[in-house]
Amino acid sequence: FGSESLNARFNAIPGTACADVTVPRDWKNPEDGHTITLRVAKTETSKGNPERQGIALVNPGGPGGSGLPWGPAMAERAPELAEQYDFIGFDPRGVGQSTALECTYTPNPEHDVWQDTKAQVDACLENELTPYITTEQTVYDMDFIRAVLGEEKTSYIGYSYGTWLGSWYQRVFPQHAHRFLLDSAVDISRDGLQTTWDLQPRSRDRQFQDAMLPYVARHDEIFGLGDDPMQIRQRWEDVGGTRTQ
């Protein structure tokens, strides 16, 4: 969303307000004088309810996904929960309308995908903000948002990478964690997210094999690729597709 369309959308949701919150660039060295801003949206829907459960932060995953619209969106999509929770959407550091991480590079049409990716990575490494765009720094941001809102604890809804983020929060701030809903969970027992990326090709291939191909086969009148899933797969591989081993 652009800022104008986003603000217009939020203004149409009763009880929603946006704010910029200033936090240290480095929570491990907050006295160094460097700060960044976080854009936060609060949708207050539980005020006056004697069964109010507090706030619930929301993160859609990524990493790199904008969470700002998700607080207001959850209030609309889950009205029963909204009676008990005020949903908090926020753009994590480096993302969206928070202090953004900008990696400026010029694509080279002669580069293959790996060379182009390396150029992007090198450009990001030149940005002095990059070392501070981490999960650990972000969970400190989340706890600061909780504290600014005057809440003793926070609940949380996270999807995909957002489950990794939520698990980190619980590990660092267990005393402030209330109810956490982790959907499409990342394996927090691993040393890092790389194992997730390693597994994704096989996961995507299984979805293609078990869901997409049978669907195409059932609708041959639309796609015209035949009614046998394995034959359709073979045709796909013949024109350049690859099978994940």
Question: Can you say where each PLM-predicted feature lies in the sequence?
Answer:
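Gly/Pro-rich cap/lid or specificity-loop segments adjacent to the active site
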Residues: 1-245
